[in-house]
């Protein structure tokens, strides 16, 4: 359910990269509810990406790509959004994926509790757009969405 709570933050017909996709959350969920999105699921584990490829066949999600590689070695660029759920600390997330985001793009990081310390450690070339508390039906736990972009000076 928490993956669905970020749908309204994503504009139509955009390119999304889900880093550390694991079982396809949130990327595959976004692709199911928003067929207008071009989604790339990225994970270093060949076991996980094999599962994702099979799931995509079963779900008939044709606009979704799966890549088996480490994010540092991934060379595709120009993503409008880079999303993660439990991938890493914010600083590492934006630093490792900086080369993949387009100039007007956004990072969307799904977090549990409010990430005070992580926000303080973000690089100077980033700017926090918003931190939204996510309301997730049937879940009595803290969830937050951190939205970050490249700073205007960059």
Language-model regions, residue ranges each:
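Conserved beta-strand signature within the Rossmann-like core of class I S-adenosyl-L-methionine
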Residues: 104-115
């Amino acid at each position: 359910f928490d993956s669905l709570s970020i749908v309204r933050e994503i504009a139509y017909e955009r390119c999304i990269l889900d880093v550390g996709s694991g079982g396809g959350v949130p990327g595959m969920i976004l692709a199911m509810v928003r067929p207008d999105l071009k989604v790339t699921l990225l994970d270093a584990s060949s076991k996980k990406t094999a599962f994702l490829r099979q799931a995509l066949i079963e779900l008939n999600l044709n606009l979704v790509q799966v890549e088996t590689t480490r994010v540092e070695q991934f060379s595709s660029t120009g993503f409008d959004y880079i999303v993660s759920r439990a991938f890493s600390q914010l600083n590492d997330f934006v630093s490792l994926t900086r080369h993949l985001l387009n100039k007007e793009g956004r990072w969307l990081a799904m977090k549990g509790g409010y990430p005070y310390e992580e926000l303080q450690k973000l690089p100077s070339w980033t700017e926090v757009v918003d931190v939204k508390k996510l309301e997730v039906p049937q879940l009595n736990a803290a969830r937050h969405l951190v939205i970050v972009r490249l700073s205007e000076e960059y």
